[in-house]
């Protein structure tokens, strides 16, 4: 247990969700993808530079990295969205993988919607995910001065 705690504190631990939990998160992310895309487009189109900059920093997606291991598990990586194109995003890996991979922090890849297992939007006031997609759209409206 001590080694596990130390690895978690050092950011060297990989935590695997149960298959049921991971599948539920992925379904929510897929179901709410249009709201995530709408939020991104609204921020990107803003006339205010400070808000437009959020399109480069606030939108994150999670997707599997590499291949499955001997226990049929696969590490998930978080990426910062750099560009949106319908059901695809260009994104940069935001954290170094814990398991050996051919991708590293800052590497950019194109991800399709079907590869996305979760998403997050980190606004100045708080963080939003698929379970709070309606609240995200309301927050974007407030940010843009529409509400």
Annotated model-derived regions:
Residues 1-147:
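Mixed-charge, low-complexity intrinsically disordered regions
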